[in-house]
Amino acid sequence: MGNILLQLLAVVALCIAPARSDWLPGTATFYGGADGSGTMGGACGYGNLYDQRYGINNAALSTPLFNDGASCGQCYLIICDYGKAPDWCKLGKAITVTGTNYGGWCNATRPYFDMSQPAWENIGIYSAGIVPILYQQVKCWRYGGVRFIINGFNYFELVLVTNMAGSGSIVSMSVKGSCTGWIQMTRNWGANWQCLAGLAGQALSFNVTSTGGQTIVFDDAVPAGWSFGQTFSTYHQFDY
């Protein structure tokens, strides 16, 4: 009897927790099939989400959440709003997802998550299709360090930054070749940052500031002699 009472108290605590001011209302549905394979790729540019260590717990974000790609890589804790949809919500369940795609075609002006089906089924009944939710942005946890994927050609470098912990996203970034000073980069699309410079053959360092306000200098993250299309892992990671 004592164990049952403790379980009931835990459920009640979960039900009232969303009343805190750091929870925001929204809606969620799902896409990508039962195995989530249809969520690979997307407007953040991550490609295969397993290769980039994001996995199946991902979501496409509506226009205000996506913020023209500035929110790519951010993490969100989501629960189904049981008080509004008791027949369709799974009581006491929560899931953390990473924003990896743009889903602006759904409720474009409102907070909306188009989640992978496996992630969505943690919180909602499949037949519901769409449910009211409560969400909050949370710290991202990643295995290993930040990774840089170098694409582009000649005098155009396009750098995809992946596996970023902390706030999960970037507010500013610059690059320095072994023969240059620091060059400011700009967001091209999603999590891809660009610069127009001839850096081929040079070792590359990156100065990255997260949306949480933390700056890390990745000295010689890319060794001299690199080629376009290569991925480079680091030992550094963001805390916020």
From Swiss-Prot:
Residues 41-145 form the Expansin-like EG45 domain. GO terms for cellular component: extracellular region; membrane. It is a peripheral membrane protein. Residues 1-21 form the signal peptide. Keywords: Cell wall, Cell wall biogenesis/degradation, Glycoprotein, Membrane, Secreted, Signal. Belongs to the expansin family. Expansin A subfamily. This is Expansin-A20. It comes from Oryza sativa subsp. japonica (Rice).
